[in-house]
């Protein structure tokens, strides 16, 4: 599993998650199964884990353990799945646990090492490969569809918002100019199309932002994250924990806002007395960052931030 993806902040995340070794938990970003394996190791025979992933490559890493239920689905469906499973499962004990809510939910956001390192997935500018970027390759638009079919205005918008790309308008113009001559079908063709916009001494950092923007658009990542957070809050039992590892400012801001206010955009909803009713409360006011030793052994951990929240009993008033 480590060859597929090295789990980030493994001990910190699982230690924060597990309060009851007999409890029921969800790992909604299964990937290589590293977090799930560690979670299972800390549960007793009565514990149970539900693991989600929409990528068929990840599902093939399933762990042979009767305490594990694998679900091939986007994590935004967690609440619907738990509600349905609570009514339909033949396992009476699991049904009772699900009816009471989950004890904890873990989400390790972003792209797995396997997805980055598999050239034909098209997630990385390090390889000249088809411009795909779909986490679920069985349907939906590809990154090639986005760069060839979106208007210049829409390209500029997603580059600016999802990638926080400097000079997004110029990049969008370069893309539309290149595709007018010939469709852009590979990562190499995209890199060539926008090379005039790349800063001389920070090409890779700039390209990473462009690719991030396209990937987020292709996979509806921000929309899925918002729906997941809402579903997670509804699915946790009072006192249950939500543990989220983020990798860029957009998703971290959304997670932070939701924990603080119960709204992805950070807008506070108050009652007539001026109290804010939020479903979660922060356990750590500041995010936990990876140790230097972990960053040295796994460079993809360097931008990670770990946030921990706990489900309130009846909503929080401030």
Give the positions of each predicted feature.
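S-adenosyl-L-methionine-dependent methyltransferase catalytic core, i.e., the SAM/SAH-binding region
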Residues: 1-318
């Amino acid at each position: 599993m480590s060859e597929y993806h090295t789990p980030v902040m493994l001990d910190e995340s699982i230690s924060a998650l597990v309060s009851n070794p007999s409890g029921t938990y969800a790992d909604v970003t299964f990937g290589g199964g590293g977090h799930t394996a560690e979670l299972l190791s800390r549960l007793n025979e009565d514990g149970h884990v539900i693991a989600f992933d929409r990528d068929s490559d990840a599902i093939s890493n399933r762990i042979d353990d009767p305490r594990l239920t694998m679900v091939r689905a986007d994590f935004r469906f967690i609440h619907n799945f738990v509600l349905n499973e609570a009514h339909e499962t033949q396992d009476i004990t699991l049904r009772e646990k699900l009816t009471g809510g989950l004890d904890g939910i873990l989400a390790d956001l972003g792209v797995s090492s396997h997805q980055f390192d598999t050239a034909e997935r098209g997630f990385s500018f390090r390889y000249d490969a088809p411009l795909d970027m779909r986490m679920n390759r069985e349907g939906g638009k590809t990154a090639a569809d986005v760069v060839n079919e979106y208007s210049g205005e829409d390209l500029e918008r997603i580059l600016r918002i999802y990638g926080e790309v400097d000079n997004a308008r110029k990049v969008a113009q370069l893309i539309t100019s290149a595709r007018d001559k010939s469709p852009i079908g590979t990562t190499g063709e995209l890199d060539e199309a926008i090379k005039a916009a790349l800063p001389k001494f920070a090409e890779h950092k700039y390209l990473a932002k462009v690719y991030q923007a396209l990937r987020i658009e292709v996979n509806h990542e921000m929309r899925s994250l918002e729906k997941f957070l809402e579903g997670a809050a509804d699915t946790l039992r009072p006192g249950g924990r939500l543990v989220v590892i983020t990798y860029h400012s957009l998703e971290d801001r959304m997670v932070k806002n939701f924990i603080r206010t119960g709204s992805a955009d950070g807008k506070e909803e108050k009652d007539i007395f001026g109290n804010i009713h939020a479903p979660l409360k922060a356990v750590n006011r500041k995010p936990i960052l990876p140790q230097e030793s972990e960053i040295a052994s796994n460079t993809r951990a360097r931008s990670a931030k770990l946030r921990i929240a706990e489900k309130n009993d009846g909503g929080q008033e401030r």
